[in-house]
Amino acid sequence: MALQIKIVAPNKVVFDDQVDEVVLPSVSGQLGILTNHAPLITGLSNGVMRVRKQGTFIPIAVLTGVAEVDNNEVSVVAMAAELGSGIDVDRARAALARAEQTLATSQNKTELLQAQTALERANARLRAAGAL
């Protein structure tokens, strides 16, 4: 028996398939989901979700959201999500550099919060792409 997983972001369905395992970047740490997992709802932090299909893990960058597990179905709604294989590594590295520069030089609290979020997003994207 497999898990049915569907990952949606505001502009698209990112992933919709049957898989053997899901590892979520929950707000309380990494959370592994296998078949017949107890029902749950959890918040997701910026990070890399991994889904295992036929022995291979597929990395997916996830930027905050929520996941629900029930009856061997995993539903993820994220602010943004992107398959690791589709990430523009150069663009993510440039975003990381900009965020690091802002964090090092800015005194504005709003800019610092935005830069911290941008840093987390760039790190998640680079990890999902296998570049970190």
UniProtKB/Swiss-Prot annotation:
<dbReference type="Pfam" id="PF00401">
    <property type="entry name" value="ATP-synt_DE"/>
</dbReference>
<keyword id="KW-0375">Hydrogen ion transport</keyword>
<dbReference type="GO" id="GO:0005524">
    <property type="term" value="F:ATP binding"/>
</dbReference>
<keyword id="KW-0472">Membrane</keyword>
<protein>
    <recommendedName>
        <fullName>ATP synthase epsilon chain</fullName>
    </recommendedName>
</protein>
<comment type="subunit">
    <text>F-type ATPases have 2 components, CF(1) - the catalytic core - and CF(0) - the membrane proton channel. CF(1) has five subunits: alpha(3), beta(3), gamma(1), delta(1), epsilon(1). CF(0) has three main subunits: a, b and c.</text>
</comment>
<dbReference type="GO" id="GO:0045259">
    <property type="term" value="C:proton-transporting ATP synthase complex"/>
</dbReference>
<keyword id="KW-1003">Cell membrane</keyword>
<comment type="function">
    <text>Produces ATP from ADP in the presence of a proton gradient across the membrane.</text>
</comment>
<keyword id="KW-0997">Cell inner membrane</keyword>
<dbReference type="InterPro" id="IPR020547">
    <property type="entry name" value="ATP_synth_F1_esu_C"/>
</dbReference>
<dbReference type="InterPro" id="IPR020546">
    <property type="entry name" value="ATP_synth_F1_dsu/esu_N"/>
</dbReference>
<dbReference type="GO" id="GO:0005886">
    <property type="term" value="C:plasma membrane"/>
</dbReference>
<keyword id="KW-0139">CF(1)</keyword>
<keyword id="KW-0406">Ion transport</keyword>
<dbReference type="InterPro" id="IPR036771">
    <property type="entry name" value="ATPsynth_dsu/esu_N"/>
</dbReference>
<keyword id="KW-0066">ATP synthesis</keyword>
<keyword id="KW-0813">Transport</keyword>
<dbReference type="InterPro" id="IPR001469">
    <property type="entry name" value="ATP_synth_F1_dsu/esu"/>
</dbReference>
<dbReference type="Pfam" id="PF02823">
    <property type="entry name" value="ATP-synt_DE_N"/>
</dbReference>
<comment type="similarity">
    <text>Belongs to the ATPase epsilon chain family.</text>
</comment>
<dbReference type="GO" id="GO:0015986">
    <property type="term" value="P:proton motive force-driven ATP synthesis"/>
</dbReference>
<dbReference type="GO" id="GO:0046933">
    <property type="term" value="F:proton-transporting ATP synthase activity, rotational mechanism"/>
</dbReference>
<dbReference type="InterPro" id="IPR036794">
    <property type="entry name" value="ATP_F1_dsu/esu_C_sf"/>
</dbReference>
